[in-house]
Regions:
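Conserved binding/recognition cores within well-folded domains
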Residues: 28-125, 129
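Phosphate- and divalent-cation-binding pockets in alpha/beta enzyme and binding domains
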Residues: 26, 139-140
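A broadly conserved detector of short glycine/acidic/proline-rich loop/turn motifs that flank catalytic sites
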Residues: 9, 22, 48, 83, ...
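N-terminal regulatory/sensing modules of transcriptional regulators
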Residues: 1-28
Length: 146
């Protein structure tokens, strides 16, 4: 993919033109990302205090007991989004759903343990251990290039 920037003093508003011979998943992803105006931050609630959580600080987003939580360096925060809404809001190249109840930040993964039959054990850099569901194993192996 080539990127070209032209500076024009007459231009009052940035304009993006995508030139391609056919529509591909890559082109659709670029268009979606450019047109997405949703905020990329998530509000986390803990002890009657609301904090803005940057996606780069989030290790994982998970559902437990009917509630959704985001785990960061500073602990766990309740978030008022459904898991699929959090998945849509977070960058799909960085955050991957590994089960019906867990989305992980690939940049925060310390190791993948493939010795388990039918699943993958993931250790995050903060020490949290989580498991890939059988349904998601193929997707994770593809991400790892296996």
């Amino acid at each position: 993919m080539q990127i070209e920037i032209k500076i024009d003093e007459k231009c009052k508003e940035p304009k993006i033109i995508v030139m391609t011979d056919k529509m591909t998943d890559e082109v659709n992803a670029i268009i979606k990302r450019l047109s997405d105006e949703q905020p990329q931050v998530i509000a986390g609630f803990r002890d009657d205090v609301v904090e803005v959580l940057e996606p780069s600080e989030i290790y994982r987003v998970f559902a437990e007991s009917g509630k959704v939580f985001a785990e960061t360096n500073h602990g766990e925060y309740a978030i008022r989004l459904r898991l699929y809404e959090a998945e849509q809001r977070l960058d799909s190249k960085t955050f991957v759903r590994i089960s019906n109840s867990d989305i992980i930040n690939l940049k925060k993964v310390k190791s993948f343990d493939l010795s388990f039959v039918g699943t993958i054990c993931i250790t995050l850099s903060n020490g949290t251990v989580t498991y890939v569901s059988r349904r998601s194993v193929a997707k994770i192996k593809q991400l790892l290039g296996m």
